[in-house]
Design a protein with these regions (language model features):
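Structural signature of the two symmetry-related core transmembrane helices
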Residues: 44, 154-169
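Cytoplasmic helix-loop-helix junction between adjacent transmembrane helices
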Residues: 1-16, 200
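Short amphipathic helix-loop junctions that connect adjacent transmembrane helices
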Residues: 106-123
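Pair of pore-lining "gating" transmembrane helices in MFS-fold secondary transporters
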Residues: 83-102, 184
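Helix-loop junctions on the cytosolic side of multi-pass membrane transporters
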Residues: 54-67, 261-271
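Residue-level signature of mid-helix packing/kink "hotspots" within the transmembrane helices
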Residues: 20-21, 133-141, 225-226
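Juxtamembrane intracellular "pre-TM" segments in multi-pass secondary transporters
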Residues: 61-89
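Intracellular juxtamembrane helix-capping segments at the cytosolic ends
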Residues: 1, 192-205
Length: 271
């Protein structure tokens, strides 16, 4: 039911978040146990099993839209009451993925500079990346339910603020343990943002255009995944590893300002 969108999309988002954040450590372990070339075979088998499960177990009550009833992109946007909110959600998706992926090129090197331990640096890096997935798994469904009660826009803003608070001290940590604690807290932010974004999109978009709008949001997500490593490596090369977290925090701060501006009229309403 539509009133349970936050909980349902929160649970669904948990799988996507967990896969993105935990996969590096799983991939590293599999490569160590079975060899790097066999990781591709194992991944292919898992994807094949997932395909079969989707075909035979996922059922939906889908009513296709007649071709004559299909809306153009302009018509979809004209039927929306909160277009600026939607644009802001696209930006939030992009910034979220940029933040997650911007540290990818430098994380192992950053951890090595903190610890000086070259033997276990890959294991520790995988653990620190994955720990954010654990907290996201814990928090995502619960935060989705909270969003259903108090409004997903409030949960989204809370997630952005927590994200900003976590990124700043990451630039000044002295040990990998401190970085791991902050990454764990950052996972709660991720668990708040993804369900809130998806739920708000479903609520403000006309039924006839939901799939198309989600595809635009996915495009922003993919762009963030491409942009993140480029930004991270460029900033690290020019200003040092710590600067990556500060630059990411600046992106998040700008997103907070944009979100407050877009939500100013609906902050205390349930969309």
């Amino acid at each position: 039911p539509k009133e349970k969108n936050g909980w349902a999309l929160g649970t669904l988002s948990t799988g996507a978040i967990a896969g993105t954040l935990i996969a590096p450590s799983i991939g590293g372990a599999l490569a160590q146990w079975f060899g790097m070339e066999n990781v591709f075979i194992i991944t292919g088998v898992i994807l094949f099993i997932t395909t079969l499960l989707t075909i035979f177990l996922v059922k939906e009550d889908f009513q296709p839209v007649e071709k004559k009833d299909l809306l153009t992109t302009k018509e979809i946007f004209s039927k929306m009451d909160h277009v600026s909110v939607l644009i802001g959600l696209f930006v939030t998706t992009l910034i979220l993925q940029l933040g997650i992926t911007s540290i990818s090129p430098i994380l192992t090197l950053y951890i090595r500079s903190l610890s000086g331990d070259t033997e276990n640096v890959l294991f520790v890096s995988g653990l620190i990346v994955s720990i954010a997935g654990v907290s996201a798994i814990i928090s995502s469904p619960t935060l989705g339910k909270i969003g259903d009660r108090i409004g997903n826009q409030k949960v989204l803003l809370g997630g952005l603020i927590l994200s900003f608070i976590c990124y700043i001290p990451m630039a000044f940590v002295q040990t990998p343990f401190q970085l791991g604690v902050l990454r764990f807290l950052l996972g709660f932010s991720t668990g708040a943002l993804m369900p809130s974004i998806n739920t708000l999109i479903s609520k403000i978009t006309p039924t006839e255009g939901v799939s198309r709008v989600y595809s635009y949001n996915q495009m922003c997500s993919n762009f963030g995944q491409v942009l993140g490593p480029m930004v991270g490596s460029t900033v690290a090369h020019g200003f040092g590893y710590s600067s990556v977290f500060l630059v990411t925090a600046c992106f998040v701060l700008g997103n907070i300002g944009l979100s407050f501006f877009n939500f100013r009229k609906v902050l205390n309403k349930k969309l």
